[in-house]
């Protein structure tokens, strides 16, 4: 069945994970350690959260890579026994989201890719475990917000990855069947979300948190980055006939 909609993950798929969320997370952890007057705990905190400083990579199954910013910050605040409660957590979530959104380094060329997909009649969506406002900020910086048909974050009311809700919401927004949707992402949770929703095609990229070895068993195809997506669509005759109608 031809693909009629492509739902992309954001971090590690469209933008450089290291430049955005890793940098913002390290800064947040350092700040929290300073608040706790425990700078010596920084290395332990980020290591236990899934960051390998020697390899400069995140564990692809960690909360930092797959979960929400709020869950990560809550874990750190709890481990450091910081006072401040909900106000501190929300303040640090907002700060980390803003830092990540201010450092947007595109992977391949999302703007050109999205324009070509739209010209072919495909609906384009972005589903992220970031807050929706953070996602929209990043997409604006990439210059693609105006051509994206659907954006959702962990707070948009469609559940979280690896559940099917984000894919199904994309389908509802664009009058698609799950079998007509290709999901593109860089983590096991992205691929598991695709399977849970019954998406037609699950494509993993190795430009983010996970290696091909981790992703291969969970998806239909592993590619290096989104720059290889169009040749894959062409080779497997997944392009639809040109048309662009969506409710």
What are these regions (language model features)?
Residues 64, 105-106, 127, 158-159, ...:
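Residues that cap or flank secondary-structure elements
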Residues 1-6, 19, 34, 111-119, ...:
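Asp-based, Mg2+/Mn2+-dependent phosphohydrolase catalytic module
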Residues 13, 128-130:
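Conserved phosphate-coupling serine/threonine residues in phosphotransfer and NTP-handling enzymes
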Residues 3-111, 116-120:
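N-terminal helical cap/lid subdomain that shapes the substrate entry/recognition surface
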């Amino acid at each position: 069945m031809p693909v009629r909609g492509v739902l992309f993950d954001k971090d590690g798929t469209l933008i450089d994970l290291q430049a955005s969320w890793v940098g913002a997370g390290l800064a947040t952890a350092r700040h929290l350690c300073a608040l706790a007057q425990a700078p010596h705990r920084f290395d332990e905190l980020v290591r236990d959260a899934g960051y390998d400083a020697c390899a400069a990579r995140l564990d692809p199954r960690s909360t930092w890579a797959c979960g929400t910013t709020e869950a990560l910050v809550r874990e750190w605040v709890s481990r450091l026994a910081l006072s401040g409660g909900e106000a501190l957590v929300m303040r640090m979530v907002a700060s980390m989201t803003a830092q990540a959104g201010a450092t947007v380094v595109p992977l391949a060329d999302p703007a050109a890719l999205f324009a070509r997909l739209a010209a072919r009649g495909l609906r384009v969506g972005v589903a992220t475990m970031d807050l929706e406002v953070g996602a929209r900020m990043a997409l604006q910086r990439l210059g693609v917000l105006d051509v994206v048909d659907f954006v959702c974050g962990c707070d948009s009311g469609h559940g979280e990855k690896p559940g099917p809700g984000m894919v199904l919401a994309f389908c509802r927004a664009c009058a698609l069947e799950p079998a007509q949707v290709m999901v593109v992402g860089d983590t096991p949770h992205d691929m598991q979300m695709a399977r849970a929703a019954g998406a037609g095609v699950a494509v993993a990229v190795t430009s983010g948190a996970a290696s091909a070895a981790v992703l291969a068993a969970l998806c239909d195809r592993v590619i290096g980055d989104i720059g290889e997506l169009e040749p894959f669509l062409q080779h497997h005759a997944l392009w639809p006939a040109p048309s662009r109608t969506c409710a």
